Amino acid sequence: MAIFNFLKLISPKNRILSKANRIASEVESYKNYYRNLTDQQLFEESNKLVDLVTKQNYTILDVCVAALALIREVVYRETGEFAYRVQIIGAFIVLSGDFAEMMTGEGKTLTIVLAAYVSALEKRGVHVVTVNEYLAQRDANNAMKILKRVGMSVGCNFANLSPQLKQAAFNCDVTYTTNSELGFDYLRDNMVHSYQDKKIRELHFAIVDEGDSVLIDEARTPLIISGPSKNEFGLYVAVDRFVKSLTEQEFKIDPESRAASLTELGIKKAEQTFKKENLFALENSDLFHKIMNGLTAVKVFEQGKEYIVRDGKVLIVDHFTGRILEGRSYSNGLQQAVQAKEYVEIEPENVIVATITYQSFFRLYNRLAAVSGTALTESEEFLKIYNMVVVPVPTNRPNIRKDRSDSVFGTPQIKWMAVVKEIKKIHETSRPILIGTANIDDSELLHNLLLEANIPHEVLNAKNHSREAEIVTKAGQKNAVTISTNMAGRGTDIRLGEGVAEMGGLYVLGTERNESRRIDNQLRGRAARQGDKGETKFFISLGDSLFKRFAHDKIERAISKLGNETFDSAFFSKMLSRTQKRVEAINFDTRKNLIDYDHVLASQRELIYKQRDKFLLANDLSEMIDKMLEKFVQQFCDQYRNQKNQNLINHIALAEALNLEMNMQNTINPKVFENMTFDVAVDKTRNLVAKKISDKVNVLTKPIALNRFRDIIITSMDKHWTEHLDSVFKLREGVVLRSMEHTSPLNVYIKETDILFKTMLQKIAQDVIVQIANLTTPDEFDHSLMQANALKKLAAIKADEKSNQE
């Protein structure tokens, strides 16, 4: 037992918490010192700390005690709030690059301001990442009032800001932004044609508010910037019609993964419908892909759960938060499949121009930290993926919330009747009640049931998210009845109205257990903030999604015994807990699988983006063009080897190709290469093309040539990178079938992606050299014009001669 206690003491989270407590004690010892300083003296003290960090090689951890004590006093003078000890502890955990788990109402927002100030002393930029623009704007406004007292600037990044205003926001010491807009700005920054047009100056330090939501829940959906492609309206409609005609014997859905596939009968039907001999043949891969998308859209996705339709548009709903994912759409044709299903306008399928996952994006930061009320259940994932230790921060006051045992019902219908009865009972006492639902459909079902029962209430879901803050703020007042999807678990405190504490505080009623215990804990966490009273309870049925998908057989047996009976069952609670852990493991594997694949693409993306920046910043491109020329010449000459003797060159074909493709204007005589060995011909070709490029520079002048060449290179890189992404996504889709050949799909993917990448680099080199060689100089333009005019005159003379003869 003594050994166990010792190991527990030295665990990373306990070690970090122990140090944070020591730091907090030291910070508290500075209280009187800073209280006795004037505002101007505090400002000067802050500047001294900046000098220590930026000029004298002190780290932020070296100065964090003085810095935290100083900003604590500044906050007090601005707001009247004196940061709690637990907020100092949380701020230190964040500064250490770890994950501070702080319960709802413990002051995460202020904790972030404290940590952001200390990190801002480095003058390299701090990004505070929030889940929506309302929170970003609210928190930025509050932070601005505090940090301007110590000379720190605060910016807020929005979706609709001009490029100039975005640059200004990111040039501030602290920038508040949403995770999606930040990710998209990063991708857009790597599509600019001038380095000065970039918005983000550096990915130095990010503090992610609601870190579990951003870094885990949203990690399964990559950020994608798309460009228009071909429109195959007719094929989408045909596939949709085909999928809707399938019988239960012609397709199947795996209940755990929710993956749909065709049975043997379905495959035969597809081949007959679309007149194909073999649906799995390479030439039919696009059709097969569209059928799989159609199956997912029609047989798996449900409106109100995965997406909603508003004003003729399909909008994705975040499964975990219930919020609409603004600006996001399904990729690789799935969006079009859903549009066909819902009979709305089918937009042209887009090609992926740039993409990144949140896992890959946030790992680009020099330092990353996060704050949330619920993270401990995913502590292994945060450590493995993001190298962050989850450290639970003690509450400022003891938590006295009552978490009652679940009530289990045989069917959803009986459960909903019981939910309404429970709401009515609580509402008659005037006690506020917050009801959490798993999706939009359930929230609207309950809304209709409460209308029938004449119980006044508010509904918060993705369809009316604009009133989120207003609805959640009032949810703690007397007589309030609030129905919400998982949205209510984030961002805005529910403060108790007068007299509510005496009633027992806020009553939180969950109507279904979520896939993750963490999401359940978020809902529970809405009650009993800062030592308030509160109570939580879940009503669940054996027909709920979690049971149906992951414990189907056990439930079938239980339903036959249970019938309509209702009881609090330790057996079902244990089964539920085991099921949730199993689902969490499955979801972790899904995200881990995503990052394993994305890691391959991430290394290529990083290389391309670094090369891109190098070209944008270079004042001399000659060395880089020489490297491209080296790649190009070998491949170019390879096409013209002598077929009978590979060591010789086909001198006539090579000379013709140079004159035609490299704009040599028939100056290359085939005799130049006659009887040359292949290697000598390669050297000769390199010299000829290099001279051609050098002549371009001399005629155009270096500044003009630099800009023209740079534009050619960047345009070519972007074009071929887009094509590469398309090839990689198609490869990834098809590579899963390799598992049937007893080979690792990931290993095949790594090998073939590497081949695709090298081919892409070769294509870029070829494209760039050919375009530069064919770049028209003023002299060449005049020569071409003279040739064209001469040809016109010749044609006119011939026409006159013909006319005279007639």
UniProtKB/Swiss-Prot annotation:
InterPro entries from the UniProt entry: Helicase_ATP-bd, Helicase_C-like, P-loop_NTPase, SecA, SecA_CS, SecA_DEAD, SecA_motor_DEAD, SecA_preprotein_X-link_dom
Protein name, UniProt field: Protein translocase subunit SecA
Gene: secA
Keyword Protein transport attributed: yes
Record keywords: ATP-binding, Cell membrane, Cytoplasm, Membrane, Nucleotide-binding, Protein transport, Translocase, Translocation, Transport
GO biological process, one term: protein transport by the Sec complex
Record carries keyword Transport: yes
EC number annotated for this UniProt entry: 7.4.2.8
Superkingdom of origin organism: Bacteria
Function recorded in the entry: Part of the Sec protein translocase complex. Interacts with the SecYEG preprotein conducting channel. Has a central role in coupling the hydrolysis of ATP to the transfer of proteins into and across the cell membrane, serving as an ATP-driven molecular motor driving the stepwise translocation of polypeptide chains across the membrane.
A Gene Ontology cellular-component term: cell envelope Sec protein transport complex
Residues binding ATP, per UniProt: Q87, G105, E106, G107, K108, T109, D493
Disulfide bonds: none
Catalytic activity annotation: ATP + H2O + cellular proteinSide 1 = ADP + phosphate + cellular proteinSide 2
Subunit structure and binding partners: Monomer and homodimer. Part of the essential Sec protein translocation apparatus which comprises SecA, SecYEG and auxiliary proteins SecDF. Other proteins may also be involved.
Main location: membrane
Alphabetized GO MF terms: ATP binding; protein-exporting ATPase activity
One Pfam family per UniProt: SecA_PP_bind
Subcellular location: Cell membrane; Cytoplasm
Enzyme class, spelled out: translocase
